[in-house]
């Protein structure tokens, strides 16, 4: 985000491939001292914008810049006008009345606009209208405050947005501390270090599978056939049990039969993570629901991979802009030819998964792990060079597949500190999804009676597919509801 003399911040190559949409984070605080909290928020946001004036800006498109077309930048106002980025709204009822949804079976199916009234901006703004960088809305309930932060995805990614919330918490909890450094200068130096040396070189790899013409995101229709977003809560012990079974298959590579394995034994990864295994299980279950069959011809998924810790640059770790590259995995569907034999997991619960299905999930998890392992600094430089070499930067974006995974589980949202008046973050939520097949792993929340945090996951699908998904045997088992 290098700042020029005319208060313009040029967005990076990675910013340009992000979805042209707005994302809303909603933080809930249970407090009866809402008036004092609101005044702290107002003072905190004022302080934050002084060290990060980028937040006051709006996005514009430069028709031509340095021989490239349609490069986007942020225009920062140099006057005191148009500096209000916080609005507040009073609701004369308890918080749960506004955050409730429609019960369907065993999960909460949220109507696609059920939380939008809590957000300061819609998810899509026409290109003919002004495009702000970020806005905040303080929703004052009789028993709580819900702080909504809506940000442009082409300026920040999920991790960068969480860092902004952490900075805001610091500004709110103690306005009298030593003044913060001018963060925009730090971001300027970080971007220079991260994206330096991309011009006049050739990409080392082919990126046409994961990057292509920028896909259009259309508003979600609000009829009976529209998309819905459902929040699933998966049991951590069940995920660990499934991970154990997949790891056993991986360890005993001979379980991969020649006619069913697609990864040579020599190329198997050294380990599988819980993220790999849950991604594979959800991808398989959703694809089965969509195809209405136990088997399907092909599975095509993409995943946003946070590159901050993968490119060996300290400047990247605190960078607020987009730092996610797009992983693309297209693989044949399962072939269940073996006996209908179920494998038992450890402890007392039987996992409703057959031998061939376990092999397929392990194979899929191995492919995901191998793809992630290969996304290093060399890959990052190649990807950035590919984007930078495009003549028209508006024509390249992340290719969305049937299933699009993102993980924000690493975000320390529940550890944010806004001060004693606010207390702890009671709940974190998102506005509804815009893309069919969107799967987001939410920040982990560890309660006092859990050794391992459960997995909260947002899934966006047509309502009929979500209804079928919550009835799937493997999904029910992963949620710990197989006995109901």
Swiss-Prot record:
Pathway: Alkaloid biosynthesis; ergot alkaloid biosynthesis
Keyword Transferase: yes
Listed EC numbers: 2.3.1.205
Domain of life: Eukaryota
Catalytic activity: fumigaclavine B + acetyl-CoA = fumigaclavine A + CoA
Pfam families documented for this protein: TRI-like_N (PF22664)
InterPro entries linked: CAT-like_dom_sf, Plant_Fungal_Acyltransferase, Tri101-like_N
GO molecular function, one term: acyltransferase activity, transferring groups other than amino-acyl groups
Subunit structure: Monomer.
Purpose of the protein: Fumigaclavine B O-acetyltransferase; part of the gene cluster that mediates the biosynthesis of isofumigaclavines, fungal ergot alkaloids. The tryptophan dimethylallyltransferase ifgA catalyzes the first step of ergot alkaloid biosynthesis by condensing dimethylallyl diphosphate (DMAP) and tryptophan to form 4-dimethylallyl-L-tryptophan. The second step is catalyzed by the methyltransferase ifgB that methylates 4-dimethylallyl-L-tryptophan in the presence of S-adenosyl-L-methionine, resulting in the formation of N-methyl-dimethylallyl-L-tryptophan.
Protein name: Fumigaclavine B O-acetyltransferase ifgI
Upper taxonomic lineage: Eukaryota, Fungi, Dikarya, Ascomycota, Pezizomycotina
Gene: ifgI
């Amino acid at each position: 985000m290098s700042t020029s003399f005319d208060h313009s911040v040029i967005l990076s190559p990675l910013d340009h491939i992000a979805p042209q949409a707005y994302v809303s984070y909603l933080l809930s605080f249970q407090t009866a001292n809402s008036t004092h909290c609101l005044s702290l928020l107002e003072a905190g946001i004022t302080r934050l914008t002084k060290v990060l004036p980028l937040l006051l800006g709006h996005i514009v498109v430069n028709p031509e810049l340095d021989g490239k077309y349609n490069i986007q930048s942020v225009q920062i106002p140099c006057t005191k006008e148009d500096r209000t980025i916080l609005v507040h709204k009073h609701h004369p009822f308890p918080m749960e009345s506004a955050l409730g949804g429609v019960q369907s079976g065993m999960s909460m199916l949220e109507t696609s606009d059920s939380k939008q009234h809590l957000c300061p901006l819609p998810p899509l703004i026409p290109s003919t209208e002004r495009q702000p960088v970020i806005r905040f809305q303080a929703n004052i309930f009789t028993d709580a405050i819900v702080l909504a932060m809506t940000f442009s995805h082409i300026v920040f990614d999920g991790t960068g947005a969480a860092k902004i919330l952490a900075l805001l918490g610091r500004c709110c909890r103690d306005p009298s501390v030593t003044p913060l450094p001018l963060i925009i200068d730090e971001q300027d130096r970080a971007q220079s270090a991260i994206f330096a040396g991309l011009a006049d070189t050739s990409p080392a790899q082919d990126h046409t599978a994961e990057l292509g013409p920028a896909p259009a995101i259309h508003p979600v229709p609000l009829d009976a056939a529209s998309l819905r977003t459902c929040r699933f809560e998966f049991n951590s012990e069940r995920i660990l049990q499934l991970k154990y079974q997949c790891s056993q298959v991986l360890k005993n590579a001979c379980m991969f039969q020649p006619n069913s394995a697609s990864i040579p034994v020599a190329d198997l990864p050294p380990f599988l993570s819980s993220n790999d295994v849950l991604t594979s299980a959800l991808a398989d279950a959703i694809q089965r629901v969509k195809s209405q069959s136990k088997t399907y011809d092909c599975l095509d998924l993409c995943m946003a991979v946070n590159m901050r810790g993968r490119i060996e640059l300290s400047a990247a770790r605190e960078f607020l802009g987009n730092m996610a590259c797009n992983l693309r995995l297209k693989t044949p569907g399962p072939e269940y030819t073996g006996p209908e034999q179920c494998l038992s997991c450890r402890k007392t619960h039987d996992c409703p998964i057959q031998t061939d299905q376990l092999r397929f999930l392990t194979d899929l998890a191995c492919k995901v792990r191998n793809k992630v392992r290969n996304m290093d600094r060399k890959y990052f430089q190649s990807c950035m060079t590919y984007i930078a070499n495009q003549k028209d930067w508006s024509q390249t974006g992340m290719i969305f597949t049937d299933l699009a995974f993102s993980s924000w589980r690493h975000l320390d949202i529940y550890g944010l500190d806004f001060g004693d008046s606010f207390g702890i973050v009671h709940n974190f939520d998102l506005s509804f999804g815009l893309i069919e097949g969107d799967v987001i792993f939410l920040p982990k929340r560890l309660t006092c009676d859990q050794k391992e945090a459960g997995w909260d996951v947002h899934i966006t699908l047509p309502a009929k597919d979500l209804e079928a998904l919550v009835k799937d045997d493997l999904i029910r088992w992963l949620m710990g509801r197989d006995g109901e």
